[in-house]
Amino acid sequence: MKMKKSLVALCLTAGLFASVPGISLAEVNYVPQNTSAAPVIPAAALQQLTWTPVDQSKTQSTQLATGGQRLDVAGITGPVAAYSVPANIGELTLTLTSEVNKQASVFAPNVLILDQNMTPSAFFPSSYFTYQQPGVMSADRLEGVMRLTPALGQQKLYVLVFTTEKDLQQTTTLLDPAKAYAKGVGNSIPDIPDPVARHTTDGVVKLKVKTNSSSSVLVGPLFGSSGTGPVTVGNTAAPVAAPAPVAPKKSEPMLNDTESYFNKAIKDAVAKGDVDKALKLLDEAERLGSTSARSTFISSVKGKG
């Protein structure tokens, strides 16, 4: 028995460092396999959840307000998202994203990984999911990458996403759109305050599954067990079909400082005779919700700016 425990510990330690992306070894200050900080969830409560299967073919998206589930357990606040992932396709890379919405709020996710017997195997607290700045194809978001190695014989893993009362007391500082734009085009970064997103129980979380060949967190017992077989978990839901595309909603009005930044940049571009740049600034400002950029552009071109 001592030999078995030592071998398991060795596998878990070897997988730790690859499970925390983008940090040095000196910065590792928690162990994903240590699930003692995770809420204790009775097996009966887990079996009542509907676990949505996720495979490599697409990203699974859940709107918590409408697609989340209730789990009345101490340490969990608001709706949860529950997914099942195939464990017989090799090592896995799970990317979980929580998008910041237009009201400047965001769901701060915690993730509990369970093996096919519904035994907690890894815990990733909300601090693991860090703020990522918006890009060409992505919005402001909290995001984390989890690399997992299912033990031999595991058929599926379970991924439970939730938030806590402690998370709701915290906030996330975002990057102001004007700063993001200036950074993207190589302009000087304006000295304006960044918006702050409050943490809520609502939001959109997305889970993407890929196979992975690097070291990772071992999930499930390494050796055979005389225990009971896999637990049948409620009714496994079919993957939810993606909704039909809808026309994008009109952007929320931008902050005064952001509006002023774009208006000044438009005036400066017109004054220098760079109308193309002014038009690009106008398009970007209106995309972000500006209500005065167009009139600023017109008056500047007419010599009234």
UniProtKB/Swiss-Prot annotation:
Biological-process GO terms, alphabetical: carbohydrate transport
Recorded superkingdom: Bacteria
A single cellular component GO annotation: periplasmic space
Location in the cell: Periplasm
Location (main, coarse): periplasm
Keyword Signal: yes
Leader peptide range in chain numbering: 1-22
Keywords for this protein: Periplasm, Signal, Sugar transport, Transport
Protein family according to the UniProt entry: To E.coli MalM.
Function according to Swiss-Prot or TrEMBL: Not yet known. Might function in the uptake of a still unidentified substrate.
Protein name as catalogued: Maltose operon periplasmic protein
Native source organism of the sequence: Salmonella typhimurium (strain LT2 / SGSC1412 / ATCC 700720)
